[in-house]
Amino acid sequence: MKPLSSPLQQYRQTVVERLPEPLAEEPLSAQAKSVLTFSDFVQDSIIAHREWLTELESQPPQADEWQHYAAWLQEALSNVSDEAGLMRELRLFRRRIMVRIAWAQTLALVTEESILQQLSYLAETLIVAARDWLYDACCREWGTPCNAQGEAQPLLILGMGKLGGGELNFSSDIDLIFAWPEHGCTQGGRRELDNAQFFTRMGQRLIKVLDQPTQDGFVYRVDMRLRPFGESGPLVLSFAALEDYYQEQGRDWERYAMVKARIMGDSEGVYANELRAMLRPFVFRRYIDFSVIQSLRNMKGMIAREVRRRGLTDNIKLGAGGIREIEFIVQVFQLIRGGREPSLQSCSLLPTLSAIAALHLLSENDAEQLRVAYLFLRRLENLLQSINDEQTQTLPSDELNRARLAWAMDFADWPQLTGALTAHMNNVRRVFNELIGDDESETQEESLSEQWRELWQDALQEDDTTPVLAHLSEDDRKQVLTLISDFRKELDKRTIGPRGRQVLDHLMPHLLSDVCAREDAAVTLSRITALLVGIVTRTTYLELLSEFPAALNHLISLCAASPMIASQLARYPLLLDELLDPNTLYQPTATDAYRDELRQYLLRVPEDDEEQQLEALRQFKQAQLLRIAAADIAGTLPVMKVSDHLTWLAEAMIDAVVQQAWVQMVARYGKPNHLNDREGRGFAVVGYGKLGGWELGYSSDLDLIFLHDCPMDAMTDGEREIDGRQFYLRLAQRIMHLFSTRTSSGILYEVDARLRPSGAAGMLVTSTEAFADYQKNEAWTWEHQALVRARVVYGDPQLTAHFDAVRREIMTLPREGRTLQTEVREMREKMRAHLGNKHRDRFDIKADEGGITDIEFITQYLVLRYAHEKPKLTRWSDNVRILELLAQNDIMEEQEAMALTRAYTTLRDELHHLALQELPGHVSGDCFTAERDLVRASWQKWLVEE
């Protein structure tokens, strides 16, 4: 054993003096002192369990002792009679074995491969033991789940990621997917459950047993987000449902994740073999599949952006040349050729790397360098995490932990360790770039004329600027020079390191040459320098613009076109990452794919880290808004499609926010017990106004109401039991909080819930029965108008159907024409008096006479007036399709409906573009006169003359 370094010898004395009396009196071996000096986790564990030290000294850890884990754990569980006892014994066993592994790892008693094997098998042993104990307990309670032939059905667990690969790190989440073979019902229980209910309840209990913190800690943090449909999907799926999903909807990233999937426990049983055979064609294609290279390149780009976004420096997992890049290199060969080469189908990295070398897909030298680098990085990662049993891959900045790692990695000091680390990561980066790096070789841009450099460096006299700024007017030329001078003065106030200055000096001549070639150079430069002031201390973003000329070009184009985009980029520089790929920048996410994109995005954030989850939601929204706006500016999205995208994005956000709020509420109170015998959550979110009508703008707020179908006598089933209706009230309050909380990326959306029954004075969440009663007996006409543009944007099918039925019933009530006409007209006149434009020479596109609101009132009036005779008028909630229905049902002439539609879309298009220019929603009084005359005539016809 290598002696402790000088700093650690001094610290060792502090450790020994800090030990409580019984331990301090015992003679400690040199090995024990070394391990206690290295790991606070081991130190705390030994203090709590002195007998473990005796065991370690008398029976030191062995490389093959993982073979005894199952027997040792069975002995520990032999007297367990309830779930609380199970949780306690699992946690103690995990901690005891982790101390043994940390001891062996610190003293290098076993190889790093052995450490990875022990960590993975320990997790598998604990998961399987917990599953088997709970399966027996659940069968006693509910009967045994069987298929149609009466054969017992097991719960199979897929270990994903490093757990599946047998490469778990010291302090790690575990990614799991639950499945059962065939449908059927329980037999022999007090009451019959179908298999889906049985395994869902059992799965929930298994997660709680492993994941829930107690006074003994937790076993593992369990992450179930890799399952089909993520958090919104069923917790457990049948084999048939799994197969359907992966055949019909499986994404590329799910295919990569499935490479490392491994069945926990009995992996050779009939059902295990069936599941494995079912998944194999999805993962390993029969043909050689080169498309994966670009997909993996895209994934790596996403990770690189995440590293920048979260400010991750010195990260040995995600950084350039880190563990993730080695995994990507190996996966490229598995996914391209795995279908034809069985030796590449291993879920473990090192055996696959050997197979890659044997097939001559990589040179022996490259394969060996990757193997050595991988083991070096994994040892460093595990040692780092074993100091405090903490999930981190970021190198320490304090001297003590640096000294600990240098000693344990067998280096004299920290600089020697980081030197070796850099060499390994450079080797990995080289192979990665050759294989997965950008497919376009970086070419040196032609050097710019010396005058652009001099312009930036303030070396040109004003008289000398004529050649480079000749096309600009004298005023614009002076303004450009003033902007450059002011920007340089602003830089002098900032702390910018040598690297930042160097990057700026390379970037600015390029930027100036591009901006100053434009007629609108002064305006564009003013927007871009405002943005640059915000990021000059963050060299990473300057490097992004300097190293990717295309990103710089997109930045200039977008800032020139829209001050709104320039402001967004200045406020949230992480959006600059979106400029890297024009294929996605000007091509927004498919309208039906926002939920899936968001699910992938959130997978990179710890599920239990609310702050990061809130930040990620806001960052995703801003990135998507940028892409929609870029496509809008480029003319690739017409106005209707802009609103469609903004609406689908909002719905994806609502879905994710409800999911987060639900998970938090259920963790605190359990679920309302009326949900025990049914699917879903008994909850719905109804969108009104622009959201309900598919007409959102860039800065629209969300008009929402919340519904539930919870009976009066329902209670939650958690340890902190509360009234079921109180649960839904707190759920709605939590949703409002998640939307409105201001993070560094701002709020998510402004939410207005005042359209609920009785407005601001009413309950925040309403039962479906109370909502129906209010609409029938108390609601005003304007509330029925609002219902025309309402639809469920999140909710169970039965609540959605109930709301739709109530909406249809209310809208199809017979109404006296004159009375309705008067009430609608008077409401519009009140609104105009309150909200209309006070400047006669300006036209408020939305609120003034002849504007958008008049068109909306016309459609609402006609639906309420004629839906009793023509129930089909209730089908849609957006104005354009309502106008189509009015024409199809012979209420409005087709020519008038088409003209109103054109006027409506023209006015909305102008509102979108005013928003992009950060201008208010009004224009000169002589604009849109034809559209306004048309709307006035229609208003006169329907709401005055009849």
Swiss-Prot record:
EC numbers, comma separated: 2.7.7.89, 2.7.7.42
Domain of life: Bacteria
Chain spans, region Adenylyl removase: 1-440
Stretches the record annotates as Adenylyl transferase: 449-946
Pfam family membership, one: GlnE
Keyword line: ATP-binding, Magnesium, Multifunctional enzyme, Nucleotide-binding, Nucleotidyltransferase, Transferase
GO terms for biological process, alphabetical: regulation of glutamine family amino acid metabolic process
Enzyme kind, highest EC tier: transferase
Assigned protein family: Belongs to the GlnE family.
Job of this protein: Involved in the regulation of glutamine synthetase GlnA, a key enzyme in the process to assimilate ammonia. When cellular nitrogen levels are high, the C-terminal adenylyl transferase (AT) inactivates GlnA by covalent transfer of an adenylyl group from ATP to specific tyrosine residue of GlnA, thus reducing its activity. Conversely, when nitrogen levels are low, the N-terminal adenylyl removase (AR) activates GlnA by removing the adenylyl group by phosphorolysis, increasing its activity.
Protein name: Bifunctional glutamine synthetase adenylyltransferase/adenylyl-removing enzyme
Species assigned in the record: Shigella sonnei (strain Ss046)
Lineage: Bacteria, Pseudomonadati, Pseudomonadota, Gammaproteobacteria, Enterobacterales
